[in-house]
From Swiss-Prot:
Snake venom metalloproteinase that impairs hemostasis in the envenomed animal. Its cofactor is Zn(2+). PROSITE patterns: ADAM_MEPRO, DISINTEGRIN_1, DISINTEGRIN_2, ZINC_PROTEASE. Residues 1-20 form the signal peptide. This is Zinc metalloproteinase-disintegrin-like 2d. CDD domains: ZnMc_adamalysin_II_like. Ca(2+) 1 binds at E202, D286, C390, N393. It is found in: Secreted. It is an enzyme of class 3 (hydrolase).
Length: 612
């Protein structure tokens, strides 16, 4: 039998009311000094880790005792988490720091069912918690007594800037058809299973060089800022059954790798190009957010492409580091990430139960922690219509050496499910007290799990997206849909106008339409002769600054040329290029370049039977 030893640290609690103080969070007009009392339950003789899996702190707020329960956010980092920075001479330096014993926690206030908390315990307690419907912040005081903390309401923090702050996404609500509520959607069983399946977003955050200067080249401060934001991001997205794992951060310590300017739409486009061309080749991830300290144009503090999750270029966002408060920047990042997940701004008809809404176009002065009914319905509709594939891939989870914690919403070693604490669990398949499946059940989540049982073999769980894709069906032996496969590369498609390549049917005409609109078509051969010169933007291959002209047989694998509508007696060769991304405007790999021939990775037009 395990004996439990209660260890109490810092027994005294001396509340003190202050009128005004300058803290890391800003100027605070009214605050309370508290000395949190930490109570830890440890097995007798057990070695105490640096940061325990669960902790409790007792202190007083407004003279009333509260108990803050904390549980380590074990899924904060992926197993292959990495950090990249650059030496003064521009060399890329990537490290894989140990992150198992980190100090970031989620939590709740005892006897307050609606409470939440996002706390860093790295050097004292720093973060925020919700108590009786109000947002409080806590942070250590820099006093000789290191246990002293300030607790204060968010409303008592002096606003840094009274000017309105807004998201850069623009839309005209009146132009949209009314959104069907989730209850009105006529879902098939397969669609309902997909919605119920837990989703995962593998996130990379890039800090630009202005961030480096703002934090005086203190990479620890930048990392701490990012970790705190993602910890809060995770808490917010529980509402959508989405787990966010930080797989990497990149700090542009030497110089910006793109031209970061105040025009947010331009910067976002450049960042997306860089992500597709550079970052994705180096680091597997689903979404990347650029955290910048530049002052974006006008009231804009963030921008993202709506409905772009998993897209190589557009699954990105830009977030301005606009506040001293971690929570305000985290809420902005949650807002932009929601755009990637197909969610637009809330209209007047949207409801958050009397609380500020995350998807308000204008930033609320009080941190918004809730998605509206409109946001939920739009997100569900986006998932059903688009099925972004990357968010079903479970990230590699850091191998935790400490025991699993039942009730932290994260399935760890030895657990079969984890639906939170018994008071919050709404999963009929899972025993919240043991984190084991209930007797007679086979599963609790997955595209091939229905009413706690494996779906029958042969039931379609992923429809084919095109004639080059393959529909997948449940095996009857697993809750997971089989790996997404597609037709063999080189199979004819679109009435022999193209050949399948990685599940798609790339053609020159379709690429012209994507660049120039529905009236665009591929240009005559005479335009492609420009690729034979190997000058300027017209070539087949590029190695650093050296360009190589196309051989005559390869000219339709270099720069793409299009025409817009009827040409008459004059041919106007249209092409596009980008200084920041040399691949923009080039013919896609796998595109048909002649009968029985396709463009390979060396931009050569080769026999389709030997290309793959």
């Amino acid at each position: 039998m395990i004996q439990v030893l209660l260890v109490t640290i810092c027994l005294a609690v001396f509340p003190y009311q202050g009128s005004s103080i300058i803290l890391g969070s800003g100027n605070v007009n009214d605050y309370e000094v508290v000395y949190p009392r930490k109570v830890t339950a440890l097995p007798k003789g057990a070695a105490q880790p640096k940061y325990e899996d669960t902790m409790q702190y007792e202190f007083k707020v407004n003279g009333e005792p509260v108990v803050l329960h904390l549980e380590k956010n074990k899924g904060l980092f992926s197993e292959d988490y990495s950090e990249t920075h650059y030496s003064p001479d521009g060399r890329e330096i990537t490290t894989y720091p140990p992150v198992e014993d980190h100090c970031y926690y989620h939590g709740r206030i005892q006897n307050d069912a609606d409470s939440t908390a996002s706390i860093s315990a790295c050097n004292g307690l720093k973060g925020h918690f919700k108590l009786q419907g109000e947002m409080y912040l806590i942070e250590p005081l820099e006093l000789s007594d290191s246990e002293a903390h300030a607790v204060f309401k968010y409303e008592n923090v002096e606003k840094e800037d009274e000017a309105p702050k807004m998201c850069g996404v623009t839309q005209n609500w009146e132009s949209y058809e009314p959104i069907k509520k989730a209850s009105q959607l006529n879902l098939t069983p397969e669609q309902q299973r997909y919605l119920n399946t837990k989703k995962y977003i593998e996130l990379v955050i890039v800090a630009d060089n202005v961030m480096v200067k703002k934090y005086t080249s203190n990479s620890t401060a930048i990392r701490t800022r990012i970790y705190a934001c993602v910890n809060t991001l995770n808490l917010i997205y529980r509402a959508f059954n989405i787990h966010i794992a930080l797989v990497g951060i990149e700090i542009w310590s030497n110089k910006d790798l793109i031209n970061v300017i105040s025009a947010s739409n331009v910067t976002l486009d450049l960042f997306g190009n860089w992500r597709r061309r550079v970052l994705l080749r180096r680091k597997r991830h689903d979404n990347a957010q650029l955290l910048t300290a530049i002052d974006l144009d006008g009231p804009t503090i963030g921008l993202a492409r709506v409905g772009s999750m998993c897209d190589p270029k557009c699954s990105t966002g830009i977030v301005q580091d606009h506040s001293k408060l971690d929570v305000m920047v985290a809420v902005t990042m949650a807002h932009e990430l929601a755009h990637n997940l197909g969610i637009n701004h809330d209209g007047n008809q949207c409801n958050c139960g009397g609380n500020p809404c995350i998807m308000s176009a204008t930033l609320n002065f009080e941190p918004a922690y809730r998605f509206s009914d409109c946001s939920r319905d739009e997100h569900w509709r986006y998932l059903i219509d688009n099925r972004p594939p990357c968010i079903l891939n479970k990230p590699l989870i850091t191998d935790i050496v400490s025991p699993p914690v039942c009730g932290n919403y994260f399935v760890e070693v030895g657990e079969e499910c984890d639906c939170g604490l018994p008071a919050h669990c709404q999963n009929p398949c899972c025993n919240a007290a043991t984190c084991k499946l209930r007797p007679g059940t086979q599963c609790e989540d997955g595209e091939c799990c229905e009413q706690c049982q494996f779906t029958s073999a042969g039931t379609e769980c992923r429809a084919a997206k095109s004639e080059c894709d393959i529909a997948e069906s449940c095996t009857g032996q697993s809750a997971d849909c089989p790996t997404d496969n597609f037709q063999r590369n080189g199979r004819p498609c679109l009435n022999n106008n193209g050949y399948c390549y990685n599940g798609k049917c790339p053609t020159l005409d379709h690429q012209c339409i994507s660049f120039f609109g529905s009236s665009a078509t591929v240009a005559p051969d005479v335009c492609f002769n420009l690729n034979l010169k190997g000058e300027g933007n017209f070539y087949c291959r590029r190695e650093n600054t050296r360009i190589f002209p196309c051989a005559p047989q390869d000219k339709k694998c270099g720069r793409l040329f299009c025409v817009l509508g009827p040409t008459g007696n004059t041919i106007s060769c249209q092409a596009t290029s980008s200084q920041s991304n040399v691949d923009i405007g080039m013919v896609d790999l796998g595109t048909k370049c002649g009968d029985g021939r396709v463009c390979n990775s060396n931009r050569q037009c080769v026999d389709v039977n030997t290309a793959y």
